[in-house]
Amino acid sequence: MSESSTGAGLGPGIVVIDKPSGMTSHDVVARCRRIFCTRRVGHAGTLDPMATGVLVLGVDRATKILGLLAGASKEYVATIRLGQTTSTEDAEGELLQCVSARHVTDEAIATAIGRLRGDIKQVPSAVSAIKVDGRRAYRLVREGHVVELQARPVRIDRFEVLAVRPGPEVGLADVIDLDVEVECSSGTYIRALARDLGDAFGVGGHLTSLRRTRVGRFELDQAWSLEDLAELPRLSRTLDETCLLMFPRRDLTVSEVEATSNGRPISSAGIDGIYAASDADGRVIALLRDEGPRTKSVVVLHPVFVRVSIGRGIVGVIEA
């Protein structure tokens, strides 16, 4: 099938991609814009080129909720190498230092990882997309600047060691590879966990592999490859299905639908946090939150449409 003509007519929704290694998240978005025949495609959280796994994309109006998806918790499987420091804190960077990790015991690893669980302050990786004086940190690093980022609060709900192995390559007998599984809040840098774990032993550390297995309610077993989508373009979930999966539901009356679709507040529902306000057909009109006795629109997904005359008796319908 041609990528230039197969994606029309699917409507707004979410697509879960299994990102291959070597592609940037923007590369994946660009490919899916061709597959779905629309410029309105975005992603809900960057994966580094080296990393693979779950990348959640929004198509058409579903791009409006990507910011909410980006804040969801995430899960990863990764391999951390103790005994080597690189310029990027992962396998793509320049090797800066090698220090024997032979003395690091399993018990010491368990203790150090325990200190990285829970609510912690993490200094993000300098090679990140965080902006410093209006410029991305990774660009400054590549230009030779020293970038110092402030520690940020993150939460590590789970950080487990799956396996401990000696380095497999010739000449790397003094390094240790840890296969780990991490469940964490949005904004956590797994590279920074590798760095901090290596620093705890004074031997340095970096990531040699990273695979994201979950973003919020979207898991790896729901993901498609780009080749699958090029052959048969499809959505993982429609926009309405996604909203009803992620948020509590509030059913609206006819008058509430009219008000909500115009962005006007209605009476509060007594629901904590963001909720999906839907009509009788299950169409999610908007995402709302309560503010006192009234609601506040987080995002209007089905705005009101009005009929307008465009001349010679022709009537058109436009989004107000």
Swiss-Prot record:
It catalyses: uridine(55) in tRNA = pseudouridine(55) in tRNA. One of its GO terms (biological process) is mRNA pseudouridine synthesis. Its EC number is 5.4.99.25. Pfam families: TruB_C, TruB_C_2, TruB_N. One of its GO terms (molecular function) is tRNA pseudouridine(55) synthase activity. The active site is at D48. It comes from the Bacteria. Keywords: Isomerase, tRNA processing. Belongs to the pseudouridine synthase TruB family. Type 1 subfamily. NCBIfam families: TruB. Responsible for synthesis of pseudouridine from uracil-55 in the psi GC loop of transfer RNAs. This is tRNA pseudouridine synthase B. It comes from Mycobacterium leprae (strain TN).
